Amino acid sequence: MKVVINDEYKNCKELVVFLESLDTRYRQKGRTLHLDRNAVRSFAITELGRDVVIKRYKKPLSVQRVVYSFFRKSKAERAYYNGLKLLELGIDTPTPIAYVEQKKAGLMEYCYFACEKTTHKSLEPLILQDKPLDDHLAMSLARFLIDLHTKGILHNDLNGGNILYYQDGDTNYH
């Protein structure tokens, strides 16, 4: 199993032990936040004093297992490094903590991405509702996407579940 941990978290022994045994602990502990193609769970890490959110990506199909094992970075690795890059560019995103890759017979089995838990909300419920998007929210979203583009970021998976926001007052969205 490959475990890559952000330098800021390497001294947290509880977290390191947890991540190194993630393949067995993931299903036994934590609180489910989302369960669909991928699973997202929240885990209390006492030593950190806060929760860590871990996304477990679905098991790749046979051909994908070969591709992710030898030719392409895993989704978890890309999420980790993309998150670090966003922070470096001043774009608010949950702090990446680690990624874990689990292989079987040398081929990718599962991969996990860990980040700090945030109080920001998913944009998805607002997009899926039957009424038009609030004008202030729509403008804030447009400004955010322009900011991403200006900084050289092309969001390749632009869906509401991948965009987090928080509201500051009645009309200020971030």
What is each model feature region?
Residues 1-21, 28:
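N-terminal presequences and immediately downstream first alpha-helices
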